[in-house]
């Protein structure tokens, strides 16, 4: 198998460190991608996971990150407009959300949320986990899907909010809620998927999760190598396995 093109890029100094601020929906995909990149390139990756909105705020305030992998392109464009980035970045994935229901829950894994509506009326639903829509793109899309289904107003008192989509998925599967609206990329990870059942919510029920990444100003060569690596076929194959739609190489 050919090494990714990034193996030699920017590698004149025996490998550097790249600090990657990444949306939490990427957690499991990046746990596979980082070791591959490190082995191929000689660079090291320091990964900081969080909600895109919180990471954006940290970068805007001068946090020393080199690459920003956002779940919502709007945050990348804001940083570009503020002169914090090399360019306007590139689309690296389209994400999806769905309803995750843990084993033993009284809810059905129904992507059209009809059972959720019934459970709200008949009292089966006590708590539903979503990411905080104030700063997590996956939470905002969950809110839009619940609005589309006509459930948002009534379900708000039952919501338990995760700081980011990874925490929302923990709430959704740990028994602290009867279910949750989570990223498909997390539900497809075996360590999450085995905890329950998952059903995709129709993509046209919410704005797209247009995930964009950008190299930040003054980043070292290792940051560019990471960007190149993520556009390689090997990387795209891993992203697809976690349910992401990825641009053609």
Located regions from the model:
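Exported/periplasmic ABC-transporter solute-binding proteins
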Residues: 2-63, 70-73, 77-85, 91-95, ...
């Amino acid at each position: 198998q050919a090494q990714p093109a990034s193996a030699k890029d920017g590698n004149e100094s025996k490998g550097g460190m790249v600090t990657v601020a990444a949306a939490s929906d990427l957690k499991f995909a990046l746990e596979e991608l980082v070791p591959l990149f490190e082995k191929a390139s000689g660079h090291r990756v320091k990964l900081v996971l969080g909600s895109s909105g919180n990471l954006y705020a940290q970068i805007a305030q001068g946090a020393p990150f080199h690459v920003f992998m956002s779940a919502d392109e709007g945050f990348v464009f804001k940083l570009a407009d503020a002169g914090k980035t090399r360019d306007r970045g590139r689309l690296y994935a389209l994400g999806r959300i769905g309803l995750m229901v843990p084993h033993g829950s009284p809810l059905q894994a129904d992507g059209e949320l009809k059972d959720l509506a019934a459970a709200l009326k008949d009292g089966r639903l006590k708590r539903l986990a979503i990411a905080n829509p104030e700063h997590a793109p996956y939470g905002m899309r969950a809110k839009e899907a619940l609005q589309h289904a006509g459930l948002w107003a009534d379900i708000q008192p039952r919501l338990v909010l995760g700081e980011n989509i990874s925490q929302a998925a923990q709430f959704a599967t740990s028994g602290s809620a009867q279910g949750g609206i989570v990223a498909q990329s997390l539900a497809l990870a075996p360590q999450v998927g085995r905890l329950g059942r998952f059903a995709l919510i129709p993509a046209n029920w919410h704005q797209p999760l247009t995930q964009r990444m950008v190299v930040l100003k003054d980043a070292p060569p290792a940051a560019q190598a990471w960007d190149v690596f993520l556009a390689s076929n090997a990387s795209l194959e891993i992203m697809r396995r976690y349910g992401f739609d990825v641009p053609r190489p």
